[in-house]
């Protein structure tokens, strides 16, 4: 505990976890130094279990010895605790509500579907992919104009303007090209959802995302390994 208090900001997570990447993005956007503790999700540490005794999942952020769990709550905590750097949640209450709404929409209605596409095959995979495209179309038609109301729905993302919803979308579909290569499927069609396509590519062009992203070949290896394990016996969930 003394070491963690001294280090002030410690993130317990996993290199391959999109949920951990959310927190790393938020910390880097705010230029907050932090220590990363790699957790073995098959053999969770007693420290992790002590810090998150309810869900027993990553990520957990420890600030001044006090743990915060659940990635979306952690990001809000970071934004409210450190006033330096860009605002991850808009100051305007109405815009903040819209960013929260669409971040929650992606979390609730898209995350599990994308994971199902990676983990399944045959008719189950086909059905999940159809649903993914339907949700992306909703974001294209209804979400972008609210997320990017300042630019008339035109996706523009920089290190200075990246918000909660950008972070959530980034950690889901930033590596969409690797998903498509591993699966042999088209997930994001620029002709059908040009706005979403432009949004994700704008996110990928930011320096904070480039600096945090592993090499493309490594992403392919991670996805292939995850898919292979997923087509074996059912995996337990360790992330939130």
Swiss-Prot record:
| Subcellular localization | Cytoplasm, Cytosol
One term under GO cellular component = cytosol
Q: Which Pfam families match?
A: GST_N_3
GST C-terminal domain sequence ranges: 92-226
- Catalytic activity, per the record? RX + glutathione = an S-substituted glutathione + a halide anion + H(+)
Q: What does this protein do?
A: May be involved in the conjugation of reduced glutathione to a wide number of exogenous and endogenous hydrophobic electrophiles and have a detoxification role against certain herbicides.
Q: What is this protein called?
A: Glutathione S-transferase U9
Lineage, broadest ranks: Eukaryota, Viridiplantae, Streptophyta, Embryophyta, Tracheophyta
């Amino acid at each position: 505990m003394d070491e963690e208090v001294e280090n002030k900001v410690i993130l317990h997570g996993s290199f391959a976890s999109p949920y951990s990447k959310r927190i790393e993005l938020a910390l880097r956007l705010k230029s907050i130094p932090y220590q990363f503790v790699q957790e073995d999700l098959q053999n969770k540490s007693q420290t992790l279990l002590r810090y998150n005794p309810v869900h027993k999942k990553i990520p957990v952020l420890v600030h001044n010895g006090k743990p915060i769990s659940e990635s979306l709550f952690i990001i809000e905590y970071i934004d409210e605790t450190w006033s330096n750097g860009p605002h991850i949640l808009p100051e305007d209450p109405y815009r903040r509500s819209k960013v929260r709404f669409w971040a929650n929409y992606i979390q609730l209605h898209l995350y599990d579907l994308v994971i199902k596409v990676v983990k399944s095959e045959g008719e189950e995979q086909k059905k999940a992919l159809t649903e993914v495209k339907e949700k992306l179309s909703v974001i294209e038609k209804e979400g972008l104009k609210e997320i990017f109301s300042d630019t008339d729905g035109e996706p523009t993302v920089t290190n200075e303007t990246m918000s909660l919803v950008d972070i959530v979308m980034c950690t889901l579909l930033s590596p969409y090209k690797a998903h498509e290569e591993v699966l042999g499927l088209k997930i994001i069609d620029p002709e059908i959802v040009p706005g979403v396509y432009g949004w994700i590519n704008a996110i990928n062009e930011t320096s904070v995302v480039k600096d945090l992203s592993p090499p493309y070949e490594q992403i392919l290896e991670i996805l292939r390994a995850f898919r292979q394990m997923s087509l074996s016996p059912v995996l337990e969930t360790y992330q939130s």
